[in-house]
Each structure stands twice: as C-alpha cells, then as structure tokens.
Amino acid sequence: MIRGLRQIEPYVAGVQPAERKMIKLNTNENAYGASPKVREALANFDVDNLRKYSTLEQADLRAALANNLKVKPEQLMIANGSDDVLSIAFLAFFNNDEPVLFPDLTYGFYKVWADLYRVNYHEIPLAEDFTINTEDYLADNGGIILTNPNAPTGIYKPLNEIEKLLKANQDTVVIIDEAYISFGGQSALSLLNKYNNLVITRTFSKDAALAGLRVGYAIANEPLIAVMNAVKHSINPYSVDLLAERLATAAVEDWSYYQENAKKIQKTRAWFSEQLVKQGFDVLPSQANFVLTKPHDLATAKLFEELEARKIYVRYFPKVERIKDYLRISMGTQEEMEEVVKAIEEIRG
C-alpha cells in the first residue's frame, strides 16, 4: 500500500451535458452571452502572443476594474476564477486556532477547501426560513465567509447586517462572496474604506457570461491584497492567461451591456417565480440568477427526471438533507423559461 495519499471528499460540480439542443439551467451560467466588445477582442487577438507567459499583475484588467468600481488598482487581485481567488483566501487568511464560520447550506467548496487545507471550521445552520442569523457569527472565530446573495438559496443579507459582522470581528477577515451581486441586493463595496478586515470576491462567470474563461477577483485594502498576492505567487504566478485577461478587460469596458442583461434576468426571475407559485410550488425569495423551489403535488425526483428527459437540466440535491425536496433552477432567457413552465405544466398533467 502506498503511504501519504490524501483522502478528501471533492466538490461535486453540476453536470455539463454535451447535447447541442437543450435548456441548460443547472450551473447558474448567463444565457445572454458575451458583449460586442468581447467578441471583437477575441476576433482581434494575436495568437502569436500565446508563445509568451501571461502578465504577472494583470495591470490592464485591474485598471479597468478600478475605474469601474471606483477603487485603486492596488485594492484588486486577479486569479483563475473566483474559485481560485477563494482558495487563495483560505490559505492567506484562515490560519487561526479558532474555527472559520460559514453556513451549513452555502457554496459547497468552502467545506472542501477547509478540509483540504486543514482549516478548523464550523458550519452554522441557517434559520428555518433559510436566512443567515447575524448573532450566530459574533462569537470568537478565525474568520467568516458568506456568499451574498447566498447559494443555493438566493437569499440576500442586508448591508447593515453585513456591517454588524465586520464591526464585531475586526481582528479576523470577513469574506463576502459576491458572485451573484449583480442580480440583486447591495454590494459591500461601500464598506471597504471603513473596515480593514473586509474582502469581497467576484467572478466573471455569472454576470459577465465568461464562465469558460475562468477569471475572478478580490477587492480589499492593500495589506490584505498583498498577502493574497504573496500566496498566489507562491502557487502559480501565471494563473490568468493572456486571452482571459484581454477578454475580461473588454467585458469591463462594455459593462453597460451586462447591466442590461442583469435587468432582463431579474425580470425573468420575477415572472418565473410567479408562475411556479401559481402551480403550487414554494419559491425562496431570490436575488441571484436562480431560484430554489419545492414542488408539492409531485416528487422532486420525478420532476427532475422528467425535465431531464426533455433536455431541460436543473440542479437537484438529493443528498443534502435540508434541500433534498428542492430544485435549483438557473435563469435562462425569457423564451427558455417559458418553455420550462410549459414542460412543468405537462409533467403535472
């Protein structure tokens, strides 16, 4: 027997079907695609540049983001998707004896990273209505990480409650994962200059429709960004490739396009939620680009299988006790969601 092998339960990602004709609503991707400037940047990209290593600091992308977000470039760190950003953050900030706190029902990678990096952690149960109770996060801890709006619930925690957490935990890092913030709620960005312990993470996968590129970033004050960069450069200083940086920069420069698409998604989410309620479903109040919903007059497993048979792919969590009777359904285009509603009506008979 070979000694020294790591035993770990990995993160389980959503299925990536190969069909050409389908409605894919299982991984919270953006149905509206890349902006005109991104398409132009791709068409004009000089392939000969790929013989060179990528830049170390992603200066162009950081400058574009800094201008967009009204922060300094030194307050930004770019990495290979927000998963990479968050993985770096776990290594950079969670080195205390006290446990890192996060909800029992949230982004599944948090527990995986904590186990992988041997970080002490405590999963705090969400309330019965799936909300996060601020008081649960005021005890001694080694750091806090919250997705806001949360996933897979889609529920948003108000900014005044986020500030309470920051104020009560000023000697540890509080990470707010804002992967879905463009679809509802208020960003914690306004708190950045007030709290040195705040780290905000974001991704280009959701609002910018660039999930296939793998680009994400952290926003924090310079001392924390410096620690993250030190960790990043100790693992892979070239983690963001040239093409990804160029296309992400073009996306930031064309941000009004994505803002309009986010409005479409919000409108479709409201309409779709209303249709589900009319059919007797429970629907959690989402501020993300998905809804978590529970049918009442048929088994969730049957609905999942019947939708899949129609090449409509949604997310089902049969092994997660608290949401085993729920489906998470990403928002497609309005036309796609109308097809989903028709399919559900057919399945219900």
From Swiss-Prot:
PANTHER family: HISTIDINOL-PHOSPHATE AMINOTRANSFERASE, HISTIDINOL-PHOSPHATE AMINOTRANSFERASE 2. Homodimer. It holds the Pfam family Aminotran_1_2. Pathway: Amino-acid biosynthesis; L-histidine biosynthesis; L-histidine from 5-phospho-alpha-D-ribose 1-diphosphate: step 7/9. Belongs to the class-II pyridoxal-phosphate-dependent aminotransferase family. Histidinol-phosphate aminotransferase subfamily. The keyword Iron-sulfur does not apply. CDD domains: AAT_like. The modification N6-(pyridoxal phosphate)lysine is found at residue 206. One of its GO terms (biological process) is L-histidine biosynthetic process. HAMAP family: HisC_aminotrans_2. Its EC number is 2.6.1.9. InterPro entries: Aminotransferase_I/II_large, HisP_aminotrans, HistidinolP_aminotransfase, PyrdxlP-dep_Trfase, PyrdxlP-dep_Trfase_major, PyrdxlP-dep_Trfase_small. It catalyses: L-histidinol phosphate + 2-oxoglutarate = 3-(imidazol-4-yl)-2-oxopropyl phosphate + L-glutamate. GO terms for molecular function: histidinol-phosphate transaminase activity; pyridoxal phosphate binding. This is Histidinol-phosphate aminotransferase. Keywords: Amino-acid biosynthesis, Aminotransferase, Histidine biosynthesis, Pyridoxal phosphate, Transferase. Its cofactor is pyridoxal 5'-phosphate. It comes from the Bacteria.
